[in-house]
Amino acid sequence: MARKLIYGMVCLCVSSWTHAGGIMLYEVGSDNTGLVNAGAAARAQGPSTIASNPAGMSYLEGTQISAGAQLLFGNVSFDQDSSTTSNGGNGDNGLGLTPGASFFISHQLDERWSVGFGSYGDFGLAESFGNSWTGRYYVQDASIVGLSLVPSVAYRFNDQWSLGVGLKAMYGILKSQTAINRAPFGLLDRSDGQYKYEDGTWGYGANLGAIYSPQVGTRIGLAYTSKVDLDFEDRLDVKGTGQLLNSLDGLNTKIGTSVPQTATLSLYQQLDPQWALLATVNWQDWSSFGEISLQVDTNAAGAQSTTVNANFKDTYQLALGAQYQATQKLLWNVGVAYDTSAVSDANRSLVMPVGATWRLGTGATYALDKSTLLNLGWDVVWMGDLPVDQTKSLSGQRTSGQFSNAWIQTLTGNLTWRF
């Protein structure tokens, strides 16, 4: 029997993915990491603008190629409280070291037209809490990653107006491994069962953008990314014998994940030859996200699989940043940002422990020579305490506590060649 759900474990962002108030990633390109997304849709300072606003290619001369690498690490550890009735410990730190990469190329055809291509990850989550923690009946190991391939084109009407569009093909990979309680209410001495789910699929969307420059040194950018639907399908691979699990093994399950639409408004303002100020307001449509996970619950009479609605709400970001041209070769970036939470404390899940975040970032771009730039960036994402309280409907098992002092850091580096 086929079952459909919108399943998205995303943002402890990984594999060049990181954690936002929702679960989209801003750490695409090292300069954007150091600025924590400030001015992203208006800067147009390198080919990574393909990800933030394709219209920015109109401001790039000649051919430019950028290759980058990211490393994400952090602390997302659970502390159960006295209300927990499920056995097990607090589990491992859910977030380990996670590498990632990106690639961009832009080419100016003439004074009007520019084309480019980007390959990057801007959506994802990976978490691993181990096989013996108290929340293992909700999640043990889970990941969903989205790799975007984006051919793009930009057209410059005049000195003030530029438009750009990118066609996005996103390949998503979903993996999930979760324990099943084979001894509900502790009536029997049985080890846990387990189910696995894994699939990969393509989804399609578009990036649109415009940049308006009323005067030299001032740019206002507006960018929109469409929703991308990822439809996964696999048969549950259930381990463990017994009547409770036989009905679930091989169950064909369809999972439809929606990567939400977003809108970004940015400002880049050059103050003098050394200083520039940047700002961004961003909206993400998480209220249309739908269901968050597939769960298996058991009691003495049998087993059932159910879906859980995420009860998400839209998120907003405000980011402010500055750039300082210290020397002809060295440009410093700094930024601070706040993201609202996609979920209330009452609706937060163990599968996706997201919340409101503060970001602080810095970085620098150094000109190795006239045609080669080295960029390094760092940011920290502070989530604080994330309380969770979930109860299984059949067994009544309760897992209560919080992810304490949760934080994530990202280190990025990239080289840009200009021809």
Briefly describe each language-model feature range.
Residues 12-13, 62:
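Repetitive helical segments and hydrophobic/amphipathic motifs
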Residues 15-18:
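N-terminal signal peptide c-region/cleavage motif recognized by signal peptidases
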Residues 21-36, 40, 83-88, 97-419:
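Outer-membrane beta-barrel porins/channels
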Residues 23-39, 58-77:
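Transmembrane beta-strand segments of Gram-negative outer membrane beta-barrel proteins
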Residues 69-97:
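Mid-chain, structured segments of secreted extracytoplasmic proteins
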